[in-house]
Amino acid sequence: MSARIVVSGTDTGVGKTVFSAALAGALDGYYWKPVQSGLDEETDSQTVMRLSGLGAERVWPEAYRLRTPVSPHLAAELDGVTIDHRALEAPHTDRPLVIEGAGGLLVPLTRDVTYLDLMARWRLPVVLCARTALGTINHSLLSIEALRARDVAILGVSFIGEENVETEGIIIDMGRVKRLGRLSYVTPLTRATLRQAFADGFDIGDFVKERAR
């Protein structure tokens, strides 16, 4: 069976969709966003296709497509949809699969279930995407604690933003996690520039080895 990796973030807007596109492209794999909230602009799946170079056949269809760009539990209620979290099972594919969550770990899927509940059931390794800006130490360490409390394997932390040696170092040391690398902000953001930024910041081998802890 090919590797399956869950990408989550310390909060909304950290850059995990761009990171997921880079990772899925580098792995020449598949991508899946279980629940898409917000359809008026480019969806996360469309962004990944545009930036990763993966064809539509490599992007697994969303289980739920909800109109409003809010937390999935509320978006579903506004659409009159009931999310059946038990039906959300990570697909098996013939290439590595990157699964992207929504917002942070405790974003609710329903009034009773969070994304972290889903991750704990899947038992798949998680890559935590974290900013390098002010405030990220607390957010990152809380997220690491939450994953460990549910016995979810942490593949490592992927930083996104400008280099911040002290901030990155204290998160890695206090969180006792692997630093996978850092994805710099890219301007202009294109398939080619993202591919190069990922290659400069990461070792793709770290995402396919058994290193989670």
UniProtKB/Swiss-Prot annotation:
**Pfam families attached here?**
AAA_26
Where does it localize? Cytoplasm
Which Gene3D superfamilies has this protein been placed in? P-loop containing nucleotide triphosphate hydrolases (3.40.50.300)
- The residues forming the signal peptide are none
The pathway noted for it is: Cofactor biosynthesis; biotin biosynthesis; biotin from 7,8-diaminononanoate: step 1/2
HAMAP family named among the record's database cross-references: BioD
Instruction: List ligand-binding residues for ATP.
Output: G13, V14, G15, K16, T17, V18, E100, G101, A102, G103
Q: What does this protein do?
A: Catalyzes a mechanistically unusual reaction, the ATP-dependent insertion of CO2 between the N7 and N8 nitrogen atoms of 7,8-diaminopelargonic acid (DAPA, also called 7,8-diammoniononanoate) to form a ureido ring.
Q: What is its EC number?
A: 6.3.3.3
Which cofactor(s) are needed, names only? Mg(2+)
Q: This chain belongs to which protein, by name?
A: ATP-dependent dethiobiotin synthetase BioD
Which residues are the active-site ones? Answer: K33
**Which CDD domains is this protein grouped with?**
DTBS
Positions annotated to bind substrate: S37
Which family, according to UniProt? Answer: Belongs to the dethiobiotin synthetase family.
Which InterPro entries does the entry link to? DTB_synth_BioD (IPR004472), P-loop_NTPase (IPR027417)
The record's catalysed reaction(s) read: (7R,8S)-7,8-diammoniononanoate + CO2 + ATP = (4R,5S)-dethiobiotin + ADP + phosphate + 3 H(+)
Cysteine disulfide partners in this protein? none
Task: Name the keywords, alphabetized.
Answer: ATP-binding, Biotin biosynthesis, Cytoplasm, Ligase, Magnesium, Metal-binding, Nucleotide-binding
Known partners and oligomeric status: Homodimer.
Q: Where does Mg(2+) bind?
A: T17, E100
UniProt GO cellular component terms? cytosol
What is the organism of origin for this protein? Nitrobacter winogradskyi (strain ATCC 25391 / DSM 10237 / CIP 104748 / NCIMB 11846 / Nb-255)
- Record carries keyword Magnesium: yes
GO molecular-function term, one example from the UniProt record: ATP binding
